[in-house]
UniProtKB/Swiss-Prot annotation:
[4Fe-4S] cluster 1 binds at residues 689, 692, 695, 755. It comes from Desulfocurvibacter africanus. Residues 1197-1232 are annotated as: Disordered. Mg(2+) binds at residues 963, 991, 993. This is Pyruvate:ferredoxin oxidoreductase.
């Protein structure tokens, strides 16, 4: 066998094996495992063959629970089957995992070990998820590196086939799954040679088949269940030997030796760490560094975690060990110790011999950095205080568990390793370009290469830091670069925010992308700290105006290839001419599908970069550059002590005491960021403005503030604070201004695009030309009182004079979701509950520390919460039940008070509140009166009522989520909640893909669209969720598209919120995953075209109209204008199929057009047919409810819980279970 080297990441290395060894894969996206499924789906679309000569059969399911069920079924029917998951996804699979292991089926689950959402969600790596599944009966095999992920994946598949025991192969999320390394991969023929064909044949022979049938999954009684559970023992006893055997067989092919437990370190070690996962790489690097100094230390790497084989553990442990520290990357509150520690302790206790001192340590939760200095601290603790149940990597100033860490500990990377940092802006291409650079270096030199990428939680436009290493020796540094030879800053705003040169080596290279072309410019703009570091460390300092080059060649903000060219020119890893040639080849490979124009723009950028790099010779005076005195903006203590350190990349240094134990964060912290990362921002041209407020309405980041001011409020305004006479009779006496928030603007340009006048009132200009003038103007405008009462709140213009209670989110520039949500908060924000499904809207909506939801000037605002991906509807339903129960109790108290304590004004206010408690305006009106009248009241019924003042105003419960939630994983709960009849509002932001996990197909994805998990174009149609829900008949349903009709959107919101029952509003939302060819600055235009073309028809279904004898269905959009082909081809998700599968593309587009035509005709028919006209229900009311007469035995919605009858409070299931005669004797029925 010849060696085949590949520069790849852990996910791809694993998928390479899983694809080869599997016949079926059932998948569902979850970060950070998704790319395994994406790669497998892409290979299958290309017709790649596995070791059986087949193309993998791969299907996306509606959830991880569904994927696990499909895996179970496929295994039961005799196909070797795999899946890929992590975190909450793995938890959803646990019930099926018990079934799969109980039936001895040889499936393999590949898991990118990730944190579990507890006090907060974390998409990053630790071992909480895999430990939560350790009791399922799956064998568990751990990998520590990218190479091991490949090798152990193969061992897992081979051992599963022979042992009949399913395997969970896991490796650290992000740290291994997304780390790029140069590794050796095996050919499929070599893998096939290792398969036990006899065991495979036996598996197939035992599978379910009507040709030789048997029964599985029986129900067993107490007489036999126990025995059946123990019958599998012999299979598990054989697993360790089988795994060890296949480790040896893989070693015979690769030369890489593995054991169930591997030991590295001094043969006579006295201090030994036991750990598993990527931490082992860092620990081994430290051991190699300290071994030369005679340190008697070692490490046991756990590979086979389940079954845990004590004999193999003791065979690996040096007899000289006096102190052992077991490191766990999890937290199990209330347990005497974490899982691996308890396993090790149990092994020693069962052995019954003298025990060394055994310590427990916790590290690395949520991908918390685990550095060589921390490893040194763990070893020092074993020879010093021997602190037990410690934490390392944090400062625990609450319970005192943390170990001290000396961050000045030595650089332990192998000598000659070159280390680089690239500070980029999300979506500027930096990360993608660095992945290419690593692959170019790895594939075209003898050097070892490593790449790792850290991000904040912004959807795009956030900070990205790429950490690259390369050298002549293998790289085991599974931690961030902290001593860099080369630092590149790709956004000039960063030099004033972050300490980007922290840790750079003396004589290192610093490359800046900025428009500052002269030393005078640099002296003016560079902070003193940066200048001092440059001069004192004698750095080589270069600048390149990458944005200008990108703009000139037509790339916009995509500066990646320009900065990569600079890197190859300065780093000296490859001869520069060769590097440029390889870079251009990579451009053709990466962008060839997007057309020659895109390729040429990128190659032109490379050519221009070669001649545009400018070296600066700086003066010695920079060594002592005086520190600036910055005026701190008015902020609160939480911002200064918590938010600011996190924003400046210093969050690792915050102690435990800085945080609330339950994970809560205050609202409105995003307003303090002021990142200033846009390239261009809008400039207001007053003389062209028609004062329509549409620009503010569509702004994705709430960066446009329409201002109404009285003359006296403009006294003392900045000189260029231009204000016009406000138009409209209601606004007589007011001045009007559009104020741009330049530092929070993301520069998408939607505002300028939709500005109605021919001569635009908003013109995009470079940020540097606007900042100095508009920052003072914004500060002044923000102090002018909001004029929220002058125009109707639910009008287009009036809505934008309401204070937005969601602003400056972490969404992508031009996001199609955020404008909708901001407007909803402007209409109802001060009384909203928001139950948000996990997804884009939860990540841009609540990623610590920047909270875009905010309070108004009275301290009121959306109460926002996130539970899980799958249960947002139920979560919001629970909020509604809580409000119902608590306000019902309040109403009971008010009624009792009227009978006893209340008199005069209090009595009148209570009567008014009781009559209008379910009306938001009246409940607030009388509630405000009660607050004044009962102020200071402490005792009696009135005291109780006063204590419940936060319940006076009727609350508005909203459930937010994307199409992945509503159409797929959360559909069951959504359907139940809508069917309940309860008063909740559901708002679905339909981007037609799983946006948050990177653009995978959902059931909202239309026919012919290319998405991840649908690489060959989706072959089935879009789920018609709106019409499905309409079949209930008592749910308000509407579709909206802001870019087509803002008025219709506002009308829908008003109707949906006022409807006394469930409402569902589905909004068409643009997304970067759709690949808008004109860019996200055309989001509103695309929304408009979507409706005009017939792709996204607008309609409303209001059950209240049926009660009045009217047609509840109203079609709000016109007939398609014939532009659907143009609409589809303006998006890469449709256009890209032309290049890969042209015949399929043509057929599928025709199919889409036919589906849209049929649907619109059906909608027209519904709008033209009123079946309610001739038999409106007797007693129909305007609100849609029906009076069925006194004493009628019906479940009702008004003033009663869902499952109680109005007269008796007895359980009521709306007769879903049938009559008592139909049900029979319930006592004899089998329960679940």
């Amino acid at each position: 066998m010849g060696k085949k080297m590949m520069t790849t990441d852990g996910n791809t290395a694993t998928a390479h094996v899983a694809y080869a060894m599997s016949e079926v894969a059932a998948i569902y996206p979850i970060t950070p495992s998704s790319t395994m499924g994406e790669e497998a789906d892409d290979w299958a679309a290309q017709g790649r063959k596995n070791i059986f000569g087949q193309t993998l059969t791969i299907r996306e399911m509606q959830s991880e629970a569904g994927a696990a069920g499909a895996v179970h079924g496929a295994l039961a029917a005799g196909a070797l089957t795999t899946t890929f998951t992590a975190s909450q996804g793995l938890l959803l699979m646990i019930p099926n995992m018990y079934k799969i292991s109980g039936e001895l089926l040889p499936g393999v689950f590949h898991v990118t070990a990730r944190a579990i959402a507890a006090h907060a969600l974390s998409i990053f790596g630790d071992h909480q998820d895999i430990y939560a599944a350790r009791q399922t009966g799956f064998a568990m095999l751990a990998s520590s590196s990218v190479q091991e992920a490949h090798d152990m994946a193969l061992v897992a598949h081979l051992a599963a086939i022979e042992s009949n025991v399913p395997f969970m192969h896991f490796f650290d999320g992000f740290r291994t799954s997304h780390e790029i390394q140069k590794i050796e991969v095996l050919d499929y023929a070599d893998m096939a040679s290792l398969v036990n064909q006899k065991a495979l044949a036996e598996f197939r022979a035992k599978s379910m088949n009507p040709e030789h049938p048997h029964v599985r999954g029986t129900a067993q009684n107490p007489d036999i269940y126990f025995q059946g559970r123990e019958a599998a023992n012999p299979y598990y006893l054989k697993v360790p030997g089988i795994v060890a055997e296949y480790m040896q067989k893989v070693a015979s092919l690769t030369g890489r030796s593995y054991k169930l437990f591997d030991y590295v370190g001094a043969p006579d070690a006295e201090r030994v760490i036991v750990s598993m996962g990527s931490s082992c790489e860092t620990i081994e690097e430290v051991i190699n560094h300290l071994a030369a100094k005679g340190e008697k230390i070692g490490l046991i790497k756990v590979r086979l975690y389940r079954p845990f084989v004590s004999e193999a553990f003791f065979a690996a442990l040096p007899a000289s060990a006096k102190v052992i520290t077991v490191l766990d990357r999890t937290k199990e509150p209330g347990a005497p110790g974490d899982p691996l520690y308890l396993d090790v302790c149990s092994a020693f206790v069962e052995r019954g011999e003298a025990m060394p001192k055994i310590l427990a340590g916790r590290y690395g939760l949520g991908s918390k950095e685990f550095s060589p200095a921390m490893v040194k601290s763990v070893y020092d603790n074993m020879s010093g205080a021997k602190k037990n149940h410690f934490t390392v990597g944090i400062e625990d100033d609450v319970t005192g568990t943390s170990l001290p860490v000396d961050n000045a500990f030595a650089d332990t990377t192998p000598k000659g390793t070159i280390q680089c940092q690239f500070w980029g802006l999300g979506a500027d291409g930096t990360v993608g370009a660095n992945k290419q650079a690593i692959k170019i270096i790895g594939d075209n030199t003898d050097l070892f290469a490593q790449g790792y990428f850290s991000y904040d939680s912004k959807k795009s436009g956030g900070i990205t830091i790429s950490h690259l290493r390369f050298g002549e020796k293998p790289i085991q540094s599974t931690y961030l670069v902290n001593r860099a030879d080369y630092v590149a800053c790709h956004n000039p705003a960063y030099v004033g925010i972050y300490d980007i040169l922290e840790g750079i080596k003396d004589g290192g290279t610093f490359v800046l992308n900025s428009p500052w072309s002269s030393l005078e410019d640099m002296d003016k703009h560079l902070p003193s700290g940066i200048k001092r570091t440059i001069a004192n460390k004698k750095l080589k300092f270069y600048n390149i105006d990458a944005v200008k080059i990108a703009t000139d060649v037509g790339l916009g903000g995509r500066i990646n290839m320009i900065m990569q060219t600079a890197f190859f020119k300065l780093a000296g890893v490859l001869p520069f001419e060769k590097a440029v040639d390889l870079l251009k080849k990579s451009i053709h490979k990466a962008y060839g599908k997007k057309g020659e124009k895109i390729v040429k723009m990128n190659t032109d950028a490379v050519d221009q970069a070669v001649t545009s790099l400018q070296e600066f010779k700086y003066p010695d005076s920079w060594k002592d550059a005086p520190a600036e005195t910055k005026a701190e903006p008015m902020t609160n203590e939480f911002f200064k002590n918590v938010v600011k350190p996190i924003l400046t990349q210093q969050g690792d240094k915050l102690p435990v005491s800085a945080f609330e134990a339950d994970g809560r964060f205050p609202l409105g912290t995003s307003q303090f960021e002021k990142r200033g990362v846009a390239i261009n921002v809008p400039q207001w041209v007053p003389e062209n403005c028609i004062q329509c407020n549409q620009c503010a309405f569509v702004c994705p980041h709430s960066a446009i503030l329409p201002v109404l001011a009285k003359e006296e409020e403009l006294v003392g305004a900045p000189a260029n604070f231009t204000a016009l006479e406000a138009k409209g009779k209601e606004l007589k006496g007011y001045k009007f201004r559009i104020q741009i928030n330049t530092l929070d603007c993301m520069g998408c340009g939607n505002c300028a695009d939709i500005c109605p006048p021919k001569e635009k009132a908003l013109v995009m200009q470079p940020l540097d030309t606007q900042r100095d003038a508009q920052v003072p103007n914004l500060e002044y405008a923000a102090r002018i009182p909001v004029k929220s009462e002058v125009l109707p709140r639910d009008s287009l213009k009036g809505s934008q004079f309401q204070e937005p209670l969601m602003e400056f989110s972490g969404a992508c520039s031009g996001c199609g979701e955020t404008p909708y949500v901001r407007v909803i908060t402007q209409l109802f924000g001060e009384r909203m509950f928001i139950a948000n499904a996990t997804g884009c809207s939860s990540i841009w909506g609540a990623s610590a520390p920047s909270m875009p939801y905010k309070t108004n000037r009275l301290g009121q605002g959306p109460a926002w919460g996130n539970s899980l991906f799958e249960d947002a509807a139920e979560y919001g339903f629970g909020m509604n039940m809580s409000m119902f129960a608590r306000r019902t109790h309040l109403a009971d108290l008010a009624a009792k008070a009227l009978e006893s304590d209340a008199s005069g004004d209090v009595k009148e206010a209570l009567q008014g509140w009781l009559a209008g408690k379910n009306d938001p305006i009246k409940s607030k009106e009388y509630g405000d009166k009660l607050k004044k009248l009962l102020a200071g009241q402490k005792d009696g019924l009135l005291g109780q009522i006063a204590a419940m003042s936060d319940l006076y105003t009727k609350k508005s419960v909203w459930i937010f989520g994307g199409d992945g939630w509503a159409y797929d994983i959360g559909y069951g709960g959504l359907d139940h909640v809508l069917a309940s009849g309860e008063d909740v509002n559901v708002f679905v932001m339909d981007t037609e893909v799983y946006s948050n996990t990177g653009g995978q197909s959902s059931k909202a994805t239309p026919t012919g669209a290319v998405a991840k998990f649908a690489a060959a174009g989706k072959r089935t149609g879009k789920k018609d969720l709106a019409r499905m829900v309409m079949t209930y008949g008592y749910v308000y349903v509407a579709t909206v598209s802001m870019g087509y009709s803002k008025q219709q959107f506002l009308k829908v919101l008003k109707e949906a919120e006022s409807f006394p029952g469930p409402s569902l509003v589905i909004a068409y939302a643009t997304c970067i995953n759709q690949g808008l060819r004109k860019g996200m600055g055309k989001s509103q235009d695309v929304m408009n075209t979507a409706v005009k073309s017939g792709y996204w028809p607008l309609f409303r279904y209001d059950p209240r109209l049926a009660a009045q004898g009217k047609n509840p269905f109203q079609l709000d959009s016109k007939a398609p204008d014939g532009s659907v082909e143009e609409f589809l081809m303006a998006q890469n998700r449709f256009a890209v199929l032309d290049r890969s599968f042209p015949e399929d593309a043509k057929r599928l587009r025709a199919q889409v057009a036919h589906e849209l035509d049929v649907r619109f005709k059906e909608l027209e028919h519904m709008a033209a047919t009123n079946i309610f006209e001739s038999f409106a229900p007797a007693g129909g009311k305007a609100d849609g409810s029906v009076d069925f007469g006194e004493g009628a035995e019906f479940c009702t919605r008004d003033d009663t819980p869902m499952m109680a009858r109005p007269d008796s409070g007895e359980a009521c299931d709306q007769n879903r279970a049938g009559t008592s005669e139909q049900q029979g004797d319930l006592s004899k029925r089998t329960k679940k």
